[in-house]
Each structure stands twice: as C-alpha cells, then as structure tokens.
Amino acid sequence: MITTVIEKIFGTKSERDLKKLKPIIEKINSLESEILKLSDEELKQKTFYFKEQLAQGKTLDDILPESFAVVREAARRVIGLRHYDVQLLGGMVLHQGKIAEMRTGEGKTLVATLPSYLNALTGKGVHVVTVNDYLAKRDRNWMGPIHEFLGLSVGYINREMDNEGRQEMYKKDITYVTNNELGFDYLRDNMVVRKEDRVLKKLNYCIVDEVDSILIDEARTPLIISGPAEQSTDKYEVVNRIIPSLKIRKITEDDEIKAKYSGENLSAGYDAVIDEKNHNATLTEDGIAKAEKFLGVANLYNDVESEWVHHINQALRAHHLYEKDVDYVVKDGEVIIVDEFTGRLMPGRRWSDGLHQAVEAKERIKIKEENQTLATITFQNFFKLYSKLSGMTGTAMTEAGEFWQIYKLDVVEVPPNRPSKRVDGADLVYRTEREKYNAIVADIETLWKKGAPVLVGTRSIEKSEKVSAMLRSKGIPHKVLNAKYHEMEAQIISQAGAKGSVTIATNMAGRGTDIVLGGNPATPQQQAEVVELGGLHILGTERHESRRIDNQLRGRAARQGDPGSSRFYISLDDELMRLFANTSRISGILERMGMTEGQVIESRLMSRQIEGAQRMVEGHNFDIRKHLLDYDKVMNQQRTAIYHLRNKILDGESVSEQVMQMIEEVIHETFDKYYNVKHPQSTDFNTLNIFLQRAFTIDANFSGESIKGKSKEQIDGETFEAVKKAFEERSKYFNEQGVNFNEVERMLLLQIIDQAWKQHLYELDQMQKSVSLRGYAQKDPLIEYQKESYNLYQNMLNKVRDVMVEYIFRLQLPPKRRVSPIGTPSSEGGGETSGADTYSNKKIGRNDPCPCGSGKKYKKCCGADL
C-alpha cells in the first residue's frame, strides 16, 4: 500500500532509473546527423578510434553515446534496422549490468548489439547467451554483420562443434552461445589435462537473452558432467515388477486440509502415498511389508548397501509422477526429458539419482548404467563468475526480488515503442476438463471461420495432441508445435499470424521468434486483413504454475502496437487448481449457484483463488532454487579452490615445489605418529624404518643408538634431506631416459586430484541425502552439511597429498618399445624399424595394471584410496 502511494508521487523505480538516462539519449540523437555523413570506411574507423580512447584512459561510459550512435547507423546501413530511443534505453540498462524487461516484439535481439559492441572494445570478449542452438545461429547471422562491418569478429557455438572449433569461436570479440553449451564448456575446461585443450577465456561480460528462462526456470536443475558408475542396473527391473502390485493413494491439497481437521490417516489401507504437490513418493508400513516379502528381505531399512528403499521410491515417482508425453518422450529407444517451461526436448540431459533408469524400466527399454558425477555447477554460481552480467526478457518484474536476492541484478522496465493494444479477457472457468475443451474448440472454430489467426497454448504434449484430435474431428486445419515436432519450431511459429491459421504450441515453444500479422513475410494487404480481424488471438488452455509463464504466452500477441487478444480457460480438474487451490470449496459454491453442464463463470473469487495458487507455487519453486543454491554455495567454495589448483598446475607453475611440500608434510606426520617424544628409545624403529623405505625408497636405519643426542626435529630434518635427495635422483633418472619428470609430476597430480574430486562429489551427494534426516534431531541440516563437507574436503586434500607422495616414489618407467613412423613397414613385415622411443602418457583406468609395477590393478593398489 505504502509502495503504491510512493510510486504515484515519485514514479516507479524503473521510471526513475530511465529518467537518469534521458540526457544520454538526447546526446546520442544529437550525434546522428554527424554520423550520417560518414562514409562506410570512416564509420569502420570509429572502432579503432574508440579503442585508442580506452587505451588513453577513457572509460566505456565516456564513449557510450558516440559508440551507440555508430552502432545505430551501422545497423541501418547493414540490415536496414534503426534503433528506436527505447532500444537505446534498453542497451544502456544492459551495459549497466541490469535486466531490461522489454515486451515481445520490441527488438531485444537488436538491442543487444549496442552493449555487446561497446563492451567488446575492451578486447576481453562478450558472450550473448540464448536458449537454443537455432537462436544462437540465427542471431549471429542476423546481427553479426553489424559488428563485422565495424571491424569486430563474431562467432557462435553449437553442440556438434569440436574442441578446435569452440576455441576459435570463443576467441572472437562476440560469441553467441546457449547457456548449456557455455556451462558445460566451463566444466570441461576444468577437467582437461593440457592447458591447450581449454576453450574459454576469462568470463568478462555476458548478456543473457530470455534471462528469466535461464536464470530462474532452469536454475532448479544443475549442470552435471557424469561418467559410468560401477553399479548393476538389475535392481531397476526387479523393483519395476513390484510397483503394479502396490495400492497407491494420491493426496491433494483438499485431502491435506480435510485430514488436518478430521485427523484422518491418509496412508491407512494403502501401500504407498504419492504427494503430487511436493513431488514425493513414500512407502507405508503395509507397502514395506509387501516389498520385503516380494524381495525376500527381512528388513528393507537394514539392507542399506542394496538401497532397496531408494530404488522403490524412485520407481514410484517414475510410475506416478512422471508422465510420458508430458515430462518425457520415448524416441529411438531413449527416454528424452521435456523441458517443463519451454516444451522443448533436452537430449543429453538425464535425471540423476537413479530416476532416469527407473523411467527406462517403466517404459521397458534398455536401461543405461547409472552415472556418477564428475563435475557439476548450478547456473546461479556459473553466471556469477562473470565480471559483469546482464539480461533481457519480456517478463522479469514478477521475479525482480529473486533476481536481486540471488544474482544482485536490478530489473528495469523499459516502455514499449508504441502503446500495447492487446485486450486481455477475463479467465473463463468450467467445472470439468471436458466442458473446458469443448468451449476452447468452439471458440477456435468461431475465430477460424472469420479468418482470424489463433495461437493455442498448452502445458504438455499430451494436451496439445488432445486439442489437435478435437480440431481434426471438426475438420479445422491446424499445425502442432511441441517437443515431438521441434525441428520446424521457428518456421511454424513465424506463420502463426497468417490469416486463418490455427497453431497449437506447448508452453513457450517458439519463444524468440516474432509472430508477424499476415504471415512472415506478409504483404501490406494480408497484414491489413488480419489487423481488421483483431490481430492474433491467444487461447491458453490452462494457467501455468507461474504468472510469468502466463504473461509470456499473452505477450505473443499485439507486438509493436498491433491489435491482439488473450484469454485463459480453466477447469477445476486442472493441475494447478487440483493441487494448490481449495477446489472442493469452489465446487460447492458453483453447485449452490446452480451451474449447469457447459456453463461458464467469471468471478473475482476465482481470480483470487488462481492468483493465490500461483503465488503459492512460485514461493515453493523459489524455495527449491534457494535450497539448491544454499547447498551449492558450500560446494562452490571447494570447487573454486580445486579448479584454481588445477589451473595453477596446468599453467606451468612448478609442481615439484608442491610435491616437496607434500613430502615434507608426510614426513612430519610420520614422525608425529611413530616417534615417541617422551621416551625416544621406546620408539618402534622397525615399523618406522619399514614405512620410510616403502614410502620413500630410502634405507632408513634408525635405532636407539643412532638417535642418541638428537632431537626429533633434527631426525625429521635429516630424513627430509635424504628423501629430497632420493626424489632428485628419480627426477634425474627419468630425464636421462628422455622422459620429462616435471610433466610426469603434472599429469600424475592432475589425475589424482580428478579421481579424488570425483569421489568427493559422490560423498557430498550421499551426505546431502543423509543430513536431511537430522532435522528430526532438532539439528539444522544445512549447518550439518557445511560442517561435514568441510571435514570431507580436508580429508580429500590429505588423501591427494598421501597418494601423490606414495605414487611418485613407486612410479616406474614401462619397458621401452620401438614405434614405426607412419608409412614405414613394421619389423613383422620384414622392413627396418625406425623411430624415437616413446612412453605412453595415457590416463590410467581403474582396471588397468598399476604403473608402480606391483602387478595389481590400479584400483586395488595405488588407486585404492581414490
């Protein structure tokens, strides 16, 4: 209330922020006549002029007005588009490291050329992040010529590109790339064993297109690079056979409310309870007994190693919470996840913790082995690595609080170039889903007969195909855009504004592509006809959990001052209403009002119920993202330290010094463990000598006689000098044999760190699952996680040190083998052999023979602790 009064008097925060930028707009416009007179060559020379200005001490803000004027003119000459004043405002907001909220059709792609050019002048690189490969390529090919005209290099990344191609593209001044490719490239860069294999430069400045989709919607799923775990997949098939025999109860918001007052036990008489709202599945006492009998296990919870309870819970979720053609599709014998916010397929992404395998078992397709995490990071922590971060979207104000709290990003609402003419109709509410879909199809038919273009938004593939089937039965021609037909996404959505077209699209499929009235390209006559019919009509088949996603769907209509309309259709059977609204109360009210079959209702009560349910879900989803971030913050500090250590090793810092420090620490700890300070003569010298000989290959002959008159520190120091000498002799020997010992140390240390980090991630993952139970003991799980993860991290570092010291002294050169150069006959072919002696630097596998020469497998010998 107070905020509203202040805004009426002083204007909104966005209005106040933009008011400060108006003088700069005037300055840019005043330069336009001067810039217009420049020849193409003179305009290109401005880039060199700006770089000289920066070299002489000017700041980016100092050259902003003229640089924006230059980009505006270059865009006009190269692609025939001139930036509006509001687009200049958007460009300045992005340059300030903020989020610009600009409505659909306001030209956000063109806006990004302004700050990307300005910030690329520093030579440190700019990344423009999009949601898919198509948009990255399209935007590079569309906007890239503007930058290239001005002398900057532009590239883009796609998922098929190899390492060399990526390196080349990231060297460009401006690179268009998807959020997933960028994040995975960062993780892969921190797994390489040669610095030449890294692809990214320092993360300087980033512009995130559709910033709400990337930093909010996708933030619930961390990026994970994984490798196969040494576990069998048999249990998934066994457990999958149990599920059909279990009696299931699904509980809703209504059930919980009733049980709260009646004291009813919701699980009584059932084997498992499915909580759709919180996406959980739990076995009851009856279910546990039934599962134990089926598996032949005395106690499910005592058999911790086999994780039967975990497997059963994941199978329950797979069968009752994850729906085919809603949450995933089965394509070419694979389960492919469907992005719940965009409706797009996500090939290559897999649910973790055995859930993906449980879904594969449910669909009776080949179960792929469970993966173990090798590297992981959340989008929250990844994008915070940039020196400056900005973003743009059509819908950000509803999440402004989260953007500030998580990313410290301010949101500024940029006004449209022309006032919106969109008419947003009130929600139409029906009692049942059947009545709702009949009404939707009837309205589509009415609009289609008039020739008005219609875009129907659905939440899932299943619902889009249901509407499609109903339209086919009516003989209404239409196009379907969902994850099954995503290849034609941009083409289908761009024609959604054509006269008489009916397009069905899941969620925000086609986002980033303009819908031009009359079709694309449209003739003036076609455009005028569609304008006369009221423009594009948006019909939403149900409300999304987030108001922001609903606003995105509405925003597809009425771009750049065009006419258009939007309306949502709701039933009490909709997922949002069923799970989060008190539908029994609403249903009772509707019955008392005497609602008949097919009758529609519009009321403030319904609107309040819907908005209340959406706010509840938004709060719930924010808590999930915050929970993920709280735990990842702990890991992030450790990840940063490990990656920093790896980069120091890769970048050529002396590994020998680090190894000598490790050796010294191990020697100190050895004497602390074995040497009896109070009674030196009582020291177990035999054990001490054996350990020193085994660990450091030195002949230690300590005895009560040899240590007389010496302090522990003296003996410690003498031992270190002897070990140091042995180490230097090993180094000399390797080098004499033509093997760079420094490189051996580097490769070895990297492999040990990587193995230890992989194991550490696994232990953190297991520990995070277990600490949640400590809440029952009145302990904060997050604090417990922080304490234990610190201890695990210290143990990991000690393990790296101990294994490195032991390994470096046991490492032996393999027998030399002659290698024939390419093109020369081998000795087996009767010809002479020629070539240099070579040694394999291949990464050691867990099942490979241990290089120390023991004859054992690596995992049973030097790699046993990793």
UniProtKB/Swiss-Prot annotation:
PANTHER family (UniProt xref): CHLOROPLAST PROTEIN-TRANSPORTING ATPASE (PTHR30612:SF0), SECA INNER MEMBRANE COMPONENT OF SEC PROTEIN SECRETION SYSTEM (PTHR30612)
Location relative to the cell: Cell inner membrane; Cytoplasm
Protein name in UniProt: Protein translocase subunit SecA
Function statement: Part of the Sec protein translocase complex. Interacts with the SecYEG preprotein conducting channel. Has a central role in coupling the hydrolysis of ATP to the transfer of proteins into and across the cell membrane, serving as an ATP-driven molecular motor driving the stepwise translocation of polypeptide chains across the membrane.
Keywords: ATP-binding, Cell inner membrane, Cell membrane, Cytoplasm, Membrane, Metal-binding, Nucleotide-binding, Protein transport, Translocase, Translocation, Transport, Zinc
Enzyme type, top EC level: translocase
One GO term (biological process): intracellular protein transmembrane transport
SUPFAM superfamilies for this protein: Helical scaffold and wing domains of SecA, P-loop containing nucleoside triphosphate hydrolases, Pre-protein crosslinking domain of SecA
Family: Belongs to the SecA family.
GO MF terms, alphabetically ordered: ATP binding; metal ion binding; protein-exporting ATPase activity
UniProt superkingdom: Bacteria
Cofactor section: Zn(2+)
NCBIfam families linked to this entry: PRK09200.1 (NF006630), PRK12904.1 (NF009538), secA (TIGR00963)
Gene from which this protein is expressed: secA
Disulfide bonds: none
Main localisation: membrane
Record region (Disordered): 819-858
Residues involved in Zn(2+) binding: C850, C852, C861, C862
Subunit structure, interactors included: Monomer and homodimer. Part of the essential Sec protein translocation apparatus which comprises SecA, SecYEG and auxiliary proteins SecDF. Other proteins may also be involved.
